[in-house]
Structures are given as C-alpha cells and as structure tokens.
UniProtKB/Swiss-Prot annotation:
Species per Swiss-Prot/TrEMBL record: Anaplasma phagocytophilum (strain HZ)
EC number: 6.1.1.15
Protein name (record): Proline--tRNA ligase
HAMAP family, sorted: Pro_tRNA_synth_type2 (MF_01570)
Matching NCBIfam families: PRK12325.1, proS_fam_II
Reactions this protein catalyses: tRNA(Pro) + L-proline + ATP = L-prolyl-tRNA(Pro) + AMP + diphosphate
Any GO CC annotation of this UniProt entry: cytosol
Function: Catalyzes the attachment of proline to tRNA(Pro) in a two-step reaction: proline is first activated by ATP to form Pro-AMP and then transferred to the acceptor end of tRNA(Pro).
Family: Belongs to the class-II aminoacyl-tRNA synthetase family. ProS type 2 subfamily.
Quaternary structure (record): Homodimer.
Length: 426
C-alpha cells in the first residue's frame, strides 16, 4: 500500500485531557478519530489491527468447538424483564422505543437473546452441548468514558455462551475457553494474569478476569509471585489456578487470602477478558429446560458466558507496546509488517529500490512515497509503529545499502537490497 493512496491522518498534538498513552497514540497515529465523548471512528490502520485481533480470537474459539452466529444489536426489553435484569442493570443500559411504542434496548451483552435462541430448539439432553459465539458491537452509556477506546460507549466484543447438561460438563467447557483465551493473548504477545473476579451484573457463581499488567491500568490487582510464574507457562487451566492467589480489587480479602503481607504483590491492570460460570441464573428465570436421560423434563441447562473486548484490546496493546516515539505493534497484530521509507522521493534510484521492496509485500507493506522531509517521514513511521522499517536514505546513496530497523528494539542493520528482500520475505 502506498501512503499517498492510504487514508492515514496522523496528528501532531492532542488535547490536554488526553492522559493515557493508548489514547494519545491511537489519535496521533491515525488509529481512531473521536466522533463524540466515548464514541470513535476506527480509521484504516485501526481497522486493520482490529481485524487481526478479531481473527486470532476467532481461530482460538473455533478450535474449542464454538460456532459463530450474529445476534441483533437491538433487543426486546421483554427479554430483559424476563431475566429480571431490565431494572437492575442500571443507567448503562440504553433504553429506546420503536415507532410502535415497544420498549427496546441496545445490547450491552447478549445473555437474554442467546438463551431465548437456544430454548426455542432445546428439547433433550441429546441437543446439548450448545456452544455459540459472536463478534458484535456493544453499547453501554458509561457515566465517564475515558482513556479512549479503553473505556468507550460503543465497543466491539467477542461474547461466547455455552449450554451444558451438568456442572461437570459446564466446567470442562469453562476450562477449554480459559485455555483458548490464554492462547489468544499469547499470540498477541500479551502476558495476562487470570484473577478471581466479581460476577457483577452478569451473575453466576464462578468468574475470572484476564488482566494485562501495566502501570497505567485502571484496576488494582492482588497476587502472589506464583501467579506471574503461572502466567508465563504455555498452557494451564483453572485447576492449576486454584494453587495460587490472584484476585481483583472487588474480590481481594487481605485477612483470608492466606498470603503473608510481604509476599502479596499489587499492581495495576487492564481487563481484557472475563469468563463466568452462570449455573442456571438465566435458564431458571427464562425457563430453559431439557429432558434428561431419565426422561425427566424439568432439568435447567447449565450456562457459561465469556467475553473479550476486541476494540479495548487495541488500547491495551498500545499501553504495553509503545515508547516516546509512538507505537510498537507486535507482528501478529500489526496493520502492515513493513514500512518502507524513501527519504529521497525524487531520486530515481531510491524510487526504483523502494518500488522493488514494496513489490515483495504489496499487501503487507506501507510505502511512504510522500514528498515530505526525511525527519517527518522517519517520525511518522516510528509513530505508526510497524514492526520493521526499510529506510532508503544516505546509506543507499553512498554505499548501496539499506537500513533495516527493528521498531521494537530500535536496532538498525545495514544490508544489501537482496538481503533485505530475503529478510522481509520470511
């Protein structure tokens, strides 16, 4: 992609009320543009990152046996009244009326809709398990939206729902999703810590949150050192988690945690995922039953629900991967693999070499062919944060070599054109 043909409005300065790094760089690098308080337009670079995050999550959730659906954003208020959440959910729930006066809500979550969907076809234990997920926009009327896409009023979420015959099977599903989350976050180079969490407005009896630890996180988390060691393992489940202490602020109890004060760690974290075992919280209030192996038809299905904030993850990634110059995207989620910076756009030989490099990865490289000063071009590419930069500049004019810069480390290698082509083609 040529930068001259690509909509990428970078911004030099942001408002003084923009505090977090993710908010600042998401605006400055042209990832998002603010439409209103807590409402953002995803720009081309941001949408490319979003799609990569989305696909990683989709692949891992598919791998544990979930089927993708797409439920409506607008939901009948009657379903929320049936589940007894319409009044208790609070002012975050956006309530509207259609032209016929029927009460509707804009979905902040979809437990009611998916439960209604499954009960329409569920008859026997033979119809279970049912594992469904969607990737859909959610709406919450946040009182104080802040930190850009980390806490906005409209956000993209993967929400999954499981329906099982009994507790044991439901917890196997819960554990499978727990492991899928771990794999998805690792693929994004994010180290997450799993914490015992409050059930909140969703309800249920077991809950875990996944947090990325960063000094600028919104939440306080408590854990012992073994929880961090566990988070570095390639694979672990909820059974292993029982052996360590890790809790959100809402669930932490210093007296009963069993950890000596000198061994208890505290940190700030950004919540990026949440899973719940719901038991029969919704199947009982919405009367979702099935006929079991004994022929008894009064058994309530056991449910779980699982959420990952996809657009929120973009903010979390920027919080973790940035420096004073801008963003440093991990390769797995970067909008492009390589940025090509031609510092002398009017030099025919520099132009020819830049075109050759671009032809190697036409869909995975961003070629800065604009007629700007070298300083502007280099600063812009650092701000955007692509994993690799190929710089066609003085080194090429003098010695015929290119600069290959690793954005994450800042290391620069001087390589021949052929060697650069070989390196970026891998």
């Amino acid at each position: 992609m040529r930068l001259s043909e690509f909509y990428s409005p970078t911004v030099k300065n942001v408002s003084s009320d923009v505090v977090s790094a993710s908010h600042k760089y998401s605006i400055r690098a042209g990832i998002v543009s603010q439409t209103a308080s807590g409402i953002y337009t995803l720009l081309p670079l941001g949408l490319m990152v979003l799609r990569k995050v989305e696909n990683i999550i989709r692949e891992e959730i598919n791998a544990v046996g979930f089927s993708e659906i797409l439920m409506p954003t607008m939901q009948p208020a009657d379903l929320w009244k049936e589940s007894q959440r319409y009044d208790s959910y609070g002012q975050e729930l956006i309530r509207i009326h259609d032209r016929g006066g029927r009460e509707m809500v804009l979905g902040p979550t979809h437990e009611e809709v998916v439960t209604d969907l499954v009960r329409s076809s569920l008859k026997s234990y033979r119809d279970l398990p049912v594992n469904l997920y969607q990737i859909q926009w959610k709406f919450r009327d946040e009182l104080r939206p802040r930190n850009g896409i980390l806490r906005s009023r409209e956000f993209l979420m993967m929400d999954a729902y499981s329906f099982d015959t009994d507790f044991e099977k439901a917890m196997k599903t819960y554990d499978a999703v727990f492991r899928a989350y771990r794999k998805a976050f690792k693929r994004m180079n994010l180290q997450t810590i799993a914490l015992k969490a409050d059930m909140g407005a969703i309800g249920g009896s077991v809950s875990h949150e996944f947090h990325v630890l960063t000094p600028t996180g919104e939440s306080t988390v408590y854990y012992d050192e073994r929880a961090l060691e566990l988070s570095e393992m390639n694979d672990y489940g909820i059974e292993e988690l029982k052996e360590v202490y890790a809790a959100t602020d809402d669930m932490h109890d210093e007296k009963s945690c069993g950890i000596a004060p000198e061994d208890l760690k505290t940190a700030r974290g950004i919540e990026v995922g949440h899973i719940f075992y719901l038991d029969d919280r919704y199947s009982r209030t919405m009367n979702v039953k099935f006929c079991n192996t004994d022929g008894h038809s009064g058994t309530h299905v056991k449910m779980g629900c699982y959420g990952i904030g996809i657009s929120r993850l973009i903010g979390a990634l920027i919080e973790v991967f940035h420096d004073d110059a801008g963003i440093k995207w991990p390769l797995s989620v970067a909008p492009f693999k390589v940025g090509i910076v031609n510092l002398f756009s009017k030099n025919e030989e520099c132009k020819r070499v830049s075109e050759r490099i671009h032809s190697v990865l036409p869909n995975d490289s961003l070629y800065d062919d604009r007629d700007d000063t070298p300083g502007v071009k280099l600063s812009r590419m650092d701000l955007i944060g692509l994993p690799w930069q190929v710089i066609v500049g003085n080194s090429f004019i003098k010695d015929g070599v290119l600069e290959l810069k690793n954005r994450a480390t800042g290391d620069i290698e001087l390589l021949s054109v052929d060697d650069v082509v070989s390196r970026i083609s891998v």
